[in-house]
């Protein structure tokens, strides 16, 4: 199936799969990509050698193009933006949520309490 003909909803999963495959292959050393010496007459060794001959330049080009992505600058920028957008005011937001939850729970408990057990303080 061609990537150009796949449905738009399938593109994220295909892209993620390709990214995973590229990162996996890029993490392998170039020694592991070179064919191991074996019987030259075997058809499978010829097929493997041909596939590696086609894939190795692609992996090298992809690794070189995506080098900026794996560098510390890209990750640091992402983490800084994420912190500023989501975590910077987490403490005050958490305190406000705990306070409102406590008040809501006390009000609900007070409304469920029988009048004989929980007399209003204004009645004496």
Swiss-Prot record:
Function comment: May participate in lipoprotein metabolism.
This protein's name: Apolipoprotein C-IV
Organism: Mus musculus
Gene Ontology terms: cellular component: extracellular region; high-density lipoprotein particle; very-low-density lipoprotein particle
GO BP annotations, alphabetical order: lipid storage; lipid transport; triglyceride homeostasis
Tissue localization of expression: Expressed by the liver and secreted in plasma.
Signal peptide: 1-27
Glycosylation site list: 107
Organism phylogeny: Eukaryota, Metazoa, Chordata, Craniata, Vertebrata
């Amino acid at each position: 199936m061609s990537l150009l003909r796949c449905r738009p909803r399938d593109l994220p999963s295909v892209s993620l799969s390709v990214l995973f495959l590229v990162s996996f292959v890029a993490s392998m050393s170039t020694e592991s990509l070179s064919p191991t010496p074996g019987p030259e007459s075997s058809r499978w060794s010829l097929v493997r050698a041909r596939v590696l001959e086609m894939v190795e330049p692609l992996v090298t080009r992809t690794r070189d193009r995506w080098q900026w992505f794996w560098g510390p600058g890209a990750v640091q920028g992402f983490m800084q933006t994420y912190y500023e957008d989501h975590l910077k005011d987490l403490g005050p937001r958490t305190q406000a949520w705990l306070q409102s939850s406590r008040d809501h729970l006390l009000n609900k408990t007070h409304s469920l309490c029988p009048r004989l057990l929980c007399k209003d303080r204004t009645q004496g």
